Design a protein with these regions (language model features):
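Secretory-pathway luminal glycosyltransferase catalytic domains
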Residues: 39-161
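Conserved small/polar residues in nucleotide/adenosyl-binding loops
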Residues: 162-169
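N-terminal cationic-hydrophobic initiation segments that often serve targeting/anchoring roles
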Residues: 27-28, 127-128, 164
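N-terminal pre-catalytic "stem/leader" segment of glycosyltransferase-like enzymes
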Residues: 1-39
Length: 170
């Protein structure tokens, strides 16, 4: 079994989604079982939200993987070696921000990331007011740019906005 005990300490929900998808993708590639940790405010210093936001019905185990060898992602991009020769009985760590870790199980990941009804229903109710019209939602990151000095890198404040023709205009 491979695990990712540090989910919830290395980034917020978006990072956690990549991390879970990667550990599941690596496990499925090699035929291993995998685990993600339970919600534990004593050890998770960040905002661990996977189990609160999503159904996560396809998770093999929700538990810690104690007494296993650590396996660290070596780069901030796809680590092909880790993907291809990851041994069993390891506890992976990293950000895993590439779909290459899980593209072979995309349908499973999409099912895992079905929103729980307490998040989904208010959103659907909100959308009803638009009567089926196309709607665009925009998320603006506001917190991370303020952490520049702590993280050691600069943010690019460039926003590219373009419009594409509506299918109705064709």
């Amino acid at each position: 079994m491979i695990g990712f005990d540090s989910i919830g300490t290395m980034g917020r929900l978006g990072n956690q989604m990549f991390q879970h998808a990667a550990v599941k993708g690596i496990a499925r590639k090699h035929g291993y079982e995998y685990a993600i940790p339970p919600k534990d405010p004593n050890t998770q210093i960040d905002n661990y939200g996977l189990l609160d936001a999503f159904e996560m019905k396809g998770v093999d185990h929700i538990k810690y993987c104690y007494n296993v060898v650590p396996a660290q992602e070596r780069f901030f991009h796809y680590d092909e070696e880790l993907m291809n020769i990851c041994p069993d009985n390891v506890n992976v760590a990293g950000f895993f921000q590439s779909e290459k870790y899980f593209e072979h199980i995309e349908d499973e990941i999409r099912k895992d990331y079905t929103f729980k009804n307490n998040w989904l229903q208010p959103s659907l109710d909100f959308m009803d007011q638009f009567g089926g019209e196309e709607v665009l939602f925009l998320h603006v990151r506001r917190g991370d740019p303020n952490l520049t000095d702590k993280r050691g890198f600069k943010w690019a404040y460039v926003c590219l906005l373009y419009t594409s023709p509506s299918p109705r205009d064709s």
